[in-house]
């Protein structure tokens, strides 16, 4: 339980916040850039190097790791997880604990207007196309074409959407 003098958010000094950003309690932001008019729900973590474009909505309990870029107007549902390491290991082949020097961040891009459904997991090294929709609970392992709906584990194209003007 926090006292009135304790912050309910952890926003590191290295965070760049745009105008009109709304951040709910129990968030953890560090080393990221947040564009104008973004809404960040409770219990969200956004790591260093993440770029969140103008007008995005990130729902509660989501994890956005280093290497992720969200373009303008992206919707992230509740409990969405991004992965940035294709082969995560605790130790190297010699048995020594891995350090940051042993790790390679693989970027992920979510393009303008895309929507990611609640409970989805997005593996690294993919692009979610403009206005694409990822169904709730999906596991995205490869690129999602623009203007499509994908769903499932692994996520597959279910439907093409009319192209927006």
Predicted ranges, named:
Residues 2-13, 25-126, 153-154, 159-162:
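Flexible, glycine/small-residue-enriched loop-and-beta-strand segment within the central core
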Residues 126-143, 147-149:
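C-terminal/domain-terminus segments
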């Amino acid at each position: 339980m926090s006292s009135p003098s304790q912050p309910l958010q952890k926003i590191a000094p290295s965070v760049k916040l745009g105008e009109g950003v709304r951040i709910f309690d129990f968030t953890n932001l560090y080393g990221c850039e947040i564009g104008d008019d973004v809404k960040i729900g409770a219990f969200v973590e956004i790591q260093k190097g993440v770029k969140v474009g103008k007008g995005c909505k990130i729902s509660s309990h989501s994890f956005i790791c280093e290497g992720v870029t969200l373009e303008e107007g992206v919707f992230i549902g509740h409990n969405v997880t991004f992965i940035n390491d294709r082969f995560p290991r605790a130790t190297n082949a010699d048995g020594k604990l891995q350090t940051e020097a042993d790790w390679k961040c693989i970027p992920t891009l979510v393009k303008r207007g895309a929507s990611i459904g609640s409970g989805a997991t997005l593996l690294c090294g993919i692009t979610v196309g403009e206005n694409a929709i990822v169904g709730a609970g999906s596991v995205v392992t490869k690129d999602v074409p623009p203007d499509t709906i994908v769903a499932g584990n692994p996520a597959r194209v279910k439907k093409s959407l009319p192209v927006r003007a």
